UniProtKB/Swiss-Prot annotation:
Substrates-to-products reaction catalysed: (R)-pantoate + beta-alanine + ATP = (R)-pantothenate + AMP + diphosphate + H(+); CMP + ATP = CDP + ADP; dCMP + ATP = dCDP + ADP
Protein name stated in the entry: Bifunctional pantoate ligase/cytidylate kinase
Source species of the chain: Prochlorococcus marinus subsp. pastoris (strain CCMP1986 / NIES-2087 / MED4)
Single annotated GO MF: CMP kinase activity
Subcellular location: Cytoplasm
Length: 510
């Protein structure tokens, strides 16, 4: 594809009409630095789409004419950087192209009040309205498939995400982690304004945020007042310093696992922002759903894709069911039940074929626990209070440090009610029976009629959803996905996309 520079909206529309593929869009205000280069190269390596970068200094985003006038403009250098890092086309409109004076139909938008009234919105009144207005205009003109945004401007990213949802644009946001210089300072177009002493102040600020993150990892708390006083003692001019929920931007609550420590400082006449994400533990994904909804297969693939531990809680219940059957345990007798539970050891080991083997008391039962014989008794055994208490305790112990994806029937409601992402996977009974039949036929271990399978699944659904202890039900904050008609890979991709929008990339890299 020939590299192209587009300056007029009419030319942009013509170029777009002639395209035979989707667009990856990287909006910028020019003065490109390493952070922008990462956005472009990420877009280029993500797919085979055309990569379009825009350079437009939006006047609606500036607090004063002086601030707008002083913004660095390096168009020739920007063009060179953009093309050398993977941009296929560059859109460089002027103000009248984006905001035609004679066009009275232009919508000047308001940013989400909830998201724009905190942090930068406290002093930069109207700034995010300007962001929403220009982004809306650009998205309507360009109609991209993907939008690449840096997490460095976290509040802006949230506001644009809200705009896309509100306007029902079919556009996927792909966040890119904050890029930092060798001294820990985040790349910013405004860094060029800094003197050596001002750069030193910014470095101190960024380093103190990083130190606070290290302390939080150990203590699970942060003393905002102490940190503020420490920064002031180093002559750092603080505009704001807040510890907030990363998505609502409201004051952090005691049960919030992930939070953001964000601040803005003044270095001379230059205003600069930085943040760090804080975690008490690594993220957890909880996947619940009825038998045959594809939980195990999908959860395994998600764990592999996101480099998370796969916790197959269903296999744990099946393993205990297998052991009870093997040892002929009378689980109606509490004394006998207590004795065997105190001596049970369940561990998972990776292998090259099924990815994970299940061992109970040193017996490898990976294949045995998937038999119809075990399927017919597992619901009854998993409804026993002592069994559930034992396994929930074991599961929570495994999940203490997070970094896992767990599947079962009560993960989001009972085991990990504070999981960062909860998915409720389901499918019609016919679809689930079809999948189960294919699975059994593939193994070639047992013959079973399709209609018989349908009735067994219907019976299992009733037992799971009506049991007194931890019944199968969707958590209030879970996202329900009906998987009929979707391939496994399509469902996995959908959940991974939801995860990427709900867990900052900067956290995923830790």
């Amino acid at each position: 594809m020939n590299k192209i520079i587009i300056r007029k909206t009419e030319d942009l529309k013509e170029w777009r009409r002639n395209l035979k593929c989707d667009i990856n869009f990287i909006p910028t205000m020019g003065n490109l630095h390493d952070g922008h280069q990462k956005l472009i190269s990420t877009a280029q390596s993500s797919n085979c789409n055309t990569n379009l970068l825009s350079i437009f200094v939006n006047p609606l985003q500036f607090d004063s004419k002086e601030d707008l006038k002083s913004y660095p403009k390096t168009v020739d250098k920007d063009i060179e950087i953009a093309f050398s890092n993977g941009a296929d086309a560059i859109f460089i409109p002027n103000v009248t192209d984006i905001y035609p004076k004679k066009n009275k139909s232009i919508s000047y938008l308001k940013a989400s009040k909830e998201l724009s009234s905190a942090l930068c919105g406290l002093t930069r009144v109207g700034h995010f309205d300007g962001v929403c207005t220009v982004v809306y205009r650009l998205l309507k003109l360009i109609q991209p498939k993907n939008l690449f945004l840096g997490e460095k401007d976290w509040q802006q990213l949230l506001i644009i995400k809200n705009l896309i949802e509100e306007k029902k644009f079919n556009i996927k946001i792909i966040p890119v982690p904050t890029q930092r210089d060798s001294d820990g300072v985040p790349f910013s177009s405004r860094n060029k304004h800094l003197s050596k002493s001002e750069r030193k102040s910014l470095k101190l600020f960024s380093n103190e945020l990083e130190n606070a993150k290290i302390i939080f990892k150990k203590d699970k708390r942060i003393d905002l007042k102490q940190l503020t006083n420490k920064l002031k003692s180093k002559n750092i001019s603080i505009e704001y310093l807040e510890h907030l929920h990363p998505y609502s931007l409201k004051k952090v609550q005691s049960n919030d696992n992930i939070s953001i420590l964000a601040g803005a400082i003044k270095c001379g006449k230059t205003r600069l922002i930085d943040h760090v994400f804080l975690m008490k533990r690594k993220p957890i994904i909880a996947i619940d759903g009825p038998a045959g909804s594809g939980k195990s297969t999908i959860t395994k693939l998600i764990a592999k894709e996101l480099n998370l531990l796969y916790l197959d809680t269903g296999a744990m219940y099946r393993a205990i069911s297998w052991l009870f059957k093997k040892e002929k345990i009378d689980y109606a007798k509490e004394s006998e039940l207590k004795k065997i539970l105190n001596n049970i050891s369940i561990i998972f080991k990776s292998n090259s074929i099924s990815q994970q083997d299940v061992f109970i008391n040193n017996f490898c039962v990976t294949e045995e626990i998937r038999s119809q014989e075990i399927s017919s008794i597992v619901s009854k055994i998993s409804s026993i209070k002592k069994v559930r208490e034992f396994l929930v305790y074991e599961q929570r112990k495994i999940g203490q440090s997070g970094g896992l994806v767990a599947e079962g029937r009560d993960i989001g409601t009972t085991v990990f009610p504070n999981a960062e992402l909860k998915i409720f996977l389901t499918a019609s009974i016919d679809e689930r029976a079809k999948r189960r039949k294919s699975e059994l036929d593939l193994r070639g271990t047992e013959e079973i009629d399709f209609n018989q399978l349908r009735e067994l699944i219907r019976k299992r659904d009733f037992e799971d959803s009506t049991r007194k202890i931890s019944p199968l039900k969707k958590a209030n904050d879970a996202i329900e996905l009906l998987t009929d008609g979707y391939s496994i890979n399509e469902v996995v991709e959908k959940i991974v996309n939801i995860y990427n929008l709900n867990i900052p990339k900067e956290i995923q890299l830790e």
